[in-house]
Amino acid sequence: MSFLQEVGKRRTFAIISHPDAGKTTITEKVLLFGNAIQKAGTVKGRGSNQHAKSDWMEMEKERGISVTTSVMQFPFNDCLVNLLDTPGHEDFSEDTYRTLTAVDSCLMVIDAAKGVEDRTRKLMEVTRLRDTPIVTFMNKLDREVRDPMEVLDEVESELGMACAPISWPIGCGKEFKGVYHIHRDETILYESGHGHEIQEVRTIKGLDNPELDAAVGSDLAESVREELELVMGACPEFDHELFLAGELTPVYFGTALGNFGVDHMLEGLTDWAPAPQTRQANERDVVATEDKFSGFVFKIQANMDPKHRDRIAFMRIVSGTYTQGMKMNHVRTGKNVSISDAVTFMAGDRSRAETAYAGDIIGLHNHGTIQIGDTFTQGESLKFSGIPNFAPELFRRIRLKDPLKQKQLLKGLVQLSEEGAVQVFRPLQNNDLIVGAVGVLQFDVVVARLKAEYNVEAIYEGVSVATARWVDCTDGKKMDEFQRKNQANLALDGGDNLTYIAPTMVNLNLASERFPDVQFRATREH
């Protein structure tokens, strides 16, 4: 297969949803259809150790949440799909955010009983920055749900996207009978109890087919016909151009737990979602089909293999081809490196990559030299833009139970901060270590991982910090004066960038008024 064909069949997407909307379950079912897993792992029988395939750090298994972003690749419909699973839990917004910079489209999963929820709103704001195309799956139709029309209106008004239904539900909860596929003009009937296998489904052609009345009852059949007449009148038809511009989303209905409707959504995704896209670098725009290799690191994860203390840097290939043993230029350090052992992923199972193309995600073994946002090329000096770091909103001071382990603690914290699990600040005037996070759960994760991976027992104490800002100034003299007068509030972050640690928001506002030439930034590009 030619290089252009290889790139053209790639589809790289992430799933976004509010916690508990069913994202991990959908991931399972998607992989089941991609033949990657024979029996979906969400079915945790008594005493069975078959946990969901994409939730694989110990803590995730205990809490039933996906904390780290996994990457899974599988074939479907003549395409090769790269699925990036993102943490659904409240606290992992930074990791999730960065993952969204590495995809070409997104699948939005909505709990049809609840509609648009807070976390979905936040993540959608991120996708709007790059006008990422969105496919929508309305989940949990096998439970009692809200009026589907009402939920579509909510998506339109709250997320600013027009909705074009591709399928429409017939009943819900115990009365859920299946969906009518608008594009195919056929009804697909639902049978419960087939959640963990691909089932043979019965289809009925045409809306006016008397078989439909026999299958679902004439009252329900009649009300669906009336509903669909309204839907066809009120909702726009699917328009591919508007979809690619991020202005319209195709909507599918189903139940991930019952494994129903997921395949229709996958077909839509592979048919319509874009192949790898052109990306902006500071120097120029890079087209996916260029010959020369380029890629950027959007995430670093420590110790994917508990037996080896290694770290893996996840890289999105932007253009060209990766081949085993090729030389590439690590732009930030200026060094040429030869990469012979990159890996591809199937959540938790790693295999060595022989070749990979634009759109693929590969893992590089990282011995402390790679950071988030790093660019690798075949010699050209490029820096891909738009991979931000956020100022944390919560802070704790971290203390050791055994004071002799200060060195291991610092090493562990710096490594964890490089992979974006947490941010660490070292005040200039004392030996404290302050840890900053976007959500509370990150603190628990850090203590658990320090113990498991670095054999360091640490505890937290409260600290009077309201927020942190990265500071810089083009005028060297003014910067020196600012540093002299604010020594007590300055710290270095994990990457040795100067940071202003504000005890209160009032303090921050006063400091920025007193030093108008100094810039206080709430985000920093990696």
UniProtKB/Swiss-Prot annotation:
Instruction: Give the transmembrane ranges.
Output: none
Q: Where is the tr-type G domain?
A: 8-277
Primary localization: cytoplasm
Please provide, alphabetically and separated by semicolons, the GO molecular function terms listed in this UniProt record. Answer: GTP binding; GTPase activity; guanosine tetraphosphate binding; translation release factor activity, codon nonspecific; translation release factor activity, codon specific
Question: Gene Ontology terms, cellular component aspect?
Answer: cytosol
Record-listed GTP binding positions? 17-24, 85-89, 139-142
Query: What's the domain of life for this entry?
Result: Bacteria
> What Pfam families would the database entry show?
EF-G_D2, GTP_EFTU, RF3_C
Sorted alphabetically, the keyword list is: Cytoplasm, GTP-binding, Nucleotide-binding, Protein biosynthesis
Q: Which PROSITE patterns match?
A: G_TR_1, G_TR_2
GO biological process terms, alphabetically, are:
regulation of translational termination
Q: Does the keyword Translocase apply?
A: no
Q: Which residues form a coiled coil?
A: none
Q: Where in the cell is it found?
A: Cytoplasm
Role, per record: Increases the formation of ribosomal termination complexes and stimulates activities of RF-1 and RF-2. It binds guanine nucleotides and has strong preference for UGA stop codons. It may interact directly with the ribosome. The stimulation of RF-1 and RF-2 is significantly reduced by GTP and GDP, but not by GMP.
- HAMAP family named among the record's database cross-references: Rel_fac_3 (MF_00072)
Task: Provide the family line.
Answer: Belongs to the TRAFAC class translation factor GTPase superfamily. Classic translation factor GTPase family. PrfC subfamily.
Instruction: Report what the protein is called.
Output: Peptide chain release factor 3
Which species is this record about? Aliivibrio fischeri (strain MJ11) (Vibrio fischeri)
